[in-house]
Amino acid sequence: MDFYEQLREELKKLEDSGLLITIRTLESAQGAWININGKKVLNMCSNNYLGLANNERLKEAAINAIKNWGVGPGAVRTIAGTMKIHEELEKKLAEFKKVEATLVVQSGFNANQAVIPTITNEEDGILSDELNHASIIDGVRLSKAKRYIWKHKDLNSLEEQLVKAQRDNCRRKLIITDGVFSMDGDIAPLPGIVELAKKYDALVMVDDAHGEGVLGENGRGIADHFNLTEEVDIEIGTLSKAFGVVGGFIAGKKVLIDYLKQQARPFLFSSSLSPAETAAALEATKILYESDDLVKKLWDNAKYFQSKIKEMGYDIGGTETPITPVMIYDEKKTKEFSSKLYEEGIFASSIVYPTVPKGKARIRVMISALHSKEDLDFALSKFEKIGKSLGTL
């Protein structure tokens, strides 16, 4: 059997098991309502938390940047690809995050790849929450460090693993956790993690992709939310969710950022963000710096939708953020529920095994500051209608 036939067989297996990903194409900009294949639907599955992906200020900033700086950076950051606008973004992000310095890279995924293998190796131990993001898992693999996986949000389990790492005489101990876990919307027990890190002389790294622009003062993230900015050694952020653009960043002490500029492969061997992306991200940072109006609107919407859907009889688990997992449990019924939502004009994705454990299938609803009360009421009415028709209510 040749290579391509093998690929066809693998794709067929995915299709037969119901795991083949279907990619829908948007025919409009991101917004509360979007067009997909000629159909107008309420968007309840994007990460556009604050509605900045099609914001006029960001678009104007991007257009002006193209006029002034061109469309591409032309090189990697260390040769001729660092423009003044890149440094302006990094400075503003550092001010916003209340840290000494930041480093912007091509994506949040790349940010984890830039940090983890650069600061750890075979002599070190990495303590990772079992539900951490794929980019963390891959970064840990690349580092070749010893792995100590602790049970999700279980501080007793973390301490047990720290004791093991200490017995193994690890040179460095790096605790890594997501800030907000994207499937359930729960947040990391950061105060307890920091306390254990001090006790066992470990570093703390938080990937706050879903916390940036959502938690903390003006959306500064989970470290600010818990007033622990000084205690967290490394924060990873993304510019593609609440910030509405694309890219990732690393926030921390200047010496860390200086070291990453010398050694981090994703920084050294990839071109920098385009001027348009950089300018738009800078404008998004300014908007968050200036006002918390969008963050407040996001939370008002989330609290309204979550309270109403719980009153309806749905289980939304232990979410602590606008991420709302509407539990259906049964895989087949969850997929059918998602299809019926789409027929009724709502785009909300089904999350099933293996993304989540068997029997934990859900519709993951992503609330945005762009949603109006009428939008949310429309969605609630459809959840009630479909729930009754499928017997999930």
UniProtKB/Swiss-Prot annotation:
Pfam families: Aminotran_1_2. It comes from the Bacteria. GO terms for biological process: biotin biosynthetic process. Gene3D superfamilies: Aspartate Aminotransferase, domain 1, Type I PLP-dependent aspartate aminotransferase-like (Major domain). The modification N6-(pyridoxal phosphate)lysine is found at residue 241. Pathway: Cofactor biosynthesis; biotin biosynthesis. Pyridoxal 5'-phosphate binds at residues 108-109, 182, 207-210, 238-241. The keyword Transferase applies. Substrate binds at residues 133, 355. One of its GO terms (molecular function) is glycine C-acetyltransferase activity. CDD domains: KBL_like (cd06454). Keywords: Acyltransferase, Biotin biosynthesis, Pyridoxal phosphate, Transferase. It catalyses: 6-carboxyhexanoyl-[ACP] + L-alanine + H(+) = (8S)-8-amino-7-oxononanoate + holo-[ACP] + CO2. Its EC number is 2.3.1.47. Belongs to the class-II pyridoxal-phosphate-dependent aminotransferase family. BioF subfamily. Homodimer. PANTHER family: CLASS II AMINOTRANSFERASE/8-AMINO-7-OXONONANOATE SYNTHASE (PTHR13693), LD36009P (PTHR13693:SF3). This is 8-amino-7-oxononanoate synthase.
